[in-house]
Regions:
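Acidic, Mg2+-coordinating active-site environments of NTP-dependent enzymes
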Residues: 1-151, 226
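Histidine-centered active-site/metal-ligand motif
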Residues: 9, 13, 157, 189
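Conserved phosphate/oxyanion-binding catalytic-loop motifs
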Residues: 154
Length: 226
């Protein structure tokens, strides 16, 4: 399955081109001919991955708002989750996903598509989504304050990840959106000012702190973010 291609792991891959090539290997060499490639059609990189899968002799199940296999027709926010209206083949399904955020809906659709491609019925796959528990540290609700404010923890450590989380929480905010974040040391330095700008644009209050500086001077990392 393919979800997205964003600026991440460049400390390992070096460039986005190399990172993209590594993801394409899923369909070039690992998924065999005749199997189903489940692809997020809402990703900008979808055309390239779809072309690779077709060239490798695989069947495509595209998912998402633009999906032709498993389509997201509607998404309604709930206090701690979302109600999804999905279409698969000729039927529509209402699914209550107990996870917040548009990106969680994308994750869920790819997961459901993989289950269906693996032999489960749509009903079985969607029933599983309704009882799913989020991964620890992935938009995890960890508490609430006496005045109604809620606290979430997320692993976001890239510009895209931070932007995705802040946009996911924004519809639920009744007062101020406050973000506390940092950047790891000895990793991709180019993402630091990007994350700072995203926090400034999308949150009312941004608090920059230290996040595993490793061999770097913490103050220098904070300065690059700011």
């Amino acid at each position: 399955g393919f979800l997205n291609l964003t600026q991440d792991h460049l400390d390992y891959h070096g460039t986005m081109g190399v990172y993209r090539a590594a993801k394409l290997r899923l369909f070039e060499t690992l998924l065999t001919r005749g199997r189903t490639a489940v692809l997020n059609a809402d990703s900008d990189a979808y055309p390239a991955f779809a072309a690779e899968a077709v060239g490798a002799g695989q069947t495509i199940m595209s998912v998402g708002e633009a999906g032709q296999g498993l389509q997201l027709l509607e998404r309604v926010l709930l206090p701690h989750g979302q109600q999804l209206k999905l279409r698969f083949e000729v039927r529509t399904y209402d699914v209550r996903l107990p996870l917040a955020g548009a990106f969680q809906a994308s994750n869920a659709l790819v997961a459901a598509g993989l289950c269906i491609a693996g032999g489960l019925s749509p009903e079985q796959a969607f029933a599983g989504l309704e009882t799913i528990e989020g991964a620890p540290g992935r938009l995890q609700r960890v508490g609430a304050g006496p005045r109604g404010g809620e606290a979430y923890v997320d692993y976001a450590h890239t510009p895209d990840g931070l932007e995705t989380v802040l946009k996911a929480l924004r519809p639920h905010v009744r007062g101020k959106l406050i973000v506390v974040f940092g950047a790891g040391g000895d990793r991709d330095r180019g993402k630091r000012p990007l994350m700072g700008q995203i926090a400034a644009d999308l949150a009312e209050v941004a608090i920059v702190t230290d996040d595993n500086p490793r061999g770097e001077v913490p103050a220098a990392i904070r300065a690059e973010i700011l």
